[in-house]
Amino acid sequence: MYLYIRYAAMSLFVNYIRNVMYQKFIINQDGVLKFGNVYLHRYLLDKGERCPYGGGLWKIDERRGAIMLYGRSFDFGRPDFDFVRSVDWSFLGGNEHPLLYLPHWPDETEVVPVVASNIKNQ
């Protein structure tokens, strides 16, 4: 009986973990900043895609009317915004928003605008 209860509890935990999603972003090899709601950053990659420029987490800041980018990816490391060439807004309904980076999150006293070189929105 004890083993059955333990197995059932472990099954519930595994199913819970599989269903937990986080707001994450990556910067792929083409410099495309992609948003998603996934458990792992690597789930944002399409087949044949790589993520050499890192990633992190994002949240919508209603007060600022912006997307706040923060943290780092355990899969790919800290984001390097110098390589952003375009932003894929499709996950956010195709609507553009200012992008602001919080380098010392959760401290929001320093906010850095993300400016892409040769930016073209997809």
Give, region by region, the residue ranges found by the protein language model:
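Intrinsic low-complexity, intrinsically disordered or marginally ordered coil/linker segments
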Residues: 2-122
